[in-house]
Amino acid sequence: MFSLNQRFQHVSSLALSCSFLVIALIAATSWLQLVKDNVFELESQLSHIRSATRFAKQKRYGGSAVNPTEVSKIRFNADFDFSRLFNWNTKQVFAYVTAEYEGDENPHTMNEITIWDKIIPSRDNATFTLSDIDAKYQLWDLESKITERPLTFKLHWNIQPWFGFLINGETTGSKTIELKKPVDKQKGK
Amino acid sequence: MEVLQDLGRQLVFPIDFESQSYTESISNKALYLITFFSFISGYLTESIKVSGIVFVLGLIVVLVIVLPPYSAYNKHRPQWANSGPTVVEPK
């Protein structure tokens, strides 16, 4: 602490260590707050899932003129309240709906496809009652068939905090349905 | 380069031994208190911003207290023995 330089270095280095301690405390307490609010068992409602399926011959869907791929557009209703995910350390929440299914040719592979997502920036707009909305992304598989197999639709969330790690979770309201077979004559050719 | 070395010698701003131990202990204690209060204030107001403001303001206060070589920090300068040859007067 003899010279100005030494005094400045001592104070600034200790202050840096202390700021890391503050950050660790903030991350830990906000995580405990989430556990206390029981957010890992949030409820949600996915209902009225319906689909329109077509045959795609384009290469980007993995199809060909001989063996077209089934591509499904999904519509659904969703009802969820994510305001409990917001505490003082939450920057924003990413909500997304996925479809999960096992492979047909490889029954032990689990596939997970995101069909809809939403960035929720504040607690005030965290309650959603969506009816009859289109999924943002279409649904198709490496295999040429997506219909007539059980698909489990789930709503997931992902908290992006100011300090600390990303926190992932899924809501309890999942729905398993089979998509309807496409009414199209192209497949028969 | 001579100029820079001169400038470096001018910017040392030394303080005496007692004040060195005093500034070290007070800056340590103050920073631990600031850590505690910035977390508590942020937790109670549920705002990261408040936490940061309390921490930075506290840090500025500590720097103002500790950094400058106030005249009070140089009151107990040790009296060094003369380094030159001492003249012993014959009796």
Curated annotation (Swiss-Prot), chain A:
It is a single-pass type II membrane protein. Essential component of the signal peptidase complex (SPC) which catalyzes the cleavage of N-terminal signal sequences from nascent proteins as they are translocated into the lumen of the endoplasmic reticulum. Essential for the SPC catalytic activity, possibly by stabilizing and positioning the active center of the complex close to the lumenal surface. Essential for viability. One of its GO terms (biological process) is protein targeting to ER. Belongs to the SPCS3 family. This is Signal peptidase complex subunit 3. Pfam families: SPC22. Residues 1-12 are cytoplasmic. It comes from Kluyveromyces lactis (strain ATCC 8585 / CBS 2359 / DSM 70799 / NBRC 1267 / NRRL Y-1140 / WM37). The keyword Transmembrane helix applies.
